[in-house]
């Protein structure tokens, strides 16, 4: 099993690194070269800045039984058919039962932005958010 992480704007990098090191799990952060991630080079793959370049890199390499951590619902929908476990940065599991809801939310937000309707900005990430993500990741890895 490899844990692939869509690294651009990933707020849970230290948590993922810590858990993977403690459990000796292979992980790979994928990012474009405009982002400077604090991960070992052996666990980092840098792609060009083209649109969706990191997404296609992940989708082409991820395999049955692997794990993906991303907030990109388009990417999540591409890999779910490969029997991949997908987790977002909030610790929510993305699966075939709920991907349509996440994609619809993305669609609505996109339409609102096109009409210059902007919701309030995201709340600042809290320690509780990080703890929720960590617990979700550990529960999935432990098979619960």
State each model region's role.
Residues 2-144:
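Nuclease catalytic cores that cleave nucleic-acid phosphodiester bonds
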């Amino acid at each position: 099993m490899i844990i692939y992480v869509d690294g651009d704007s990933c707020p849970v990098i230290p948590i993922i690194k810590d858990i993977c090191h403690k459990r000796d799990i292979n992980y790979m952060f994928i990012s474009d070269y405009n982002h400077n991630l604090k991960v070992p080079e052996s666990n980092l793959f840098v792609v060009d800045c083209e649109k969706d370049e990191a997404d296609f890199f992940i989708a082409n390499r991820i395999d049955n039984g692997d794990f993906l951590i991303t907030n990109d619902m388009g990417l999540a929908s591409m890999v779910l058919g490969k029997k991949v476990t997908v987790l977002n940065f909030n610790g929510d599991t993305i699966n075939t039962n709920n991907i349509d809801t996440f994609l619809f939310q993305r669609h609505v937000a996109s339409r609102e932005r096109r009409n210059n309707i902007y919701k309030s900005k995201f709340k600042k990430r809290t320690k509780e958010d990080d703890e929720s993500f960590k617990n979700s990741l550990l529960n999935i890895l432990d098979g619960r």
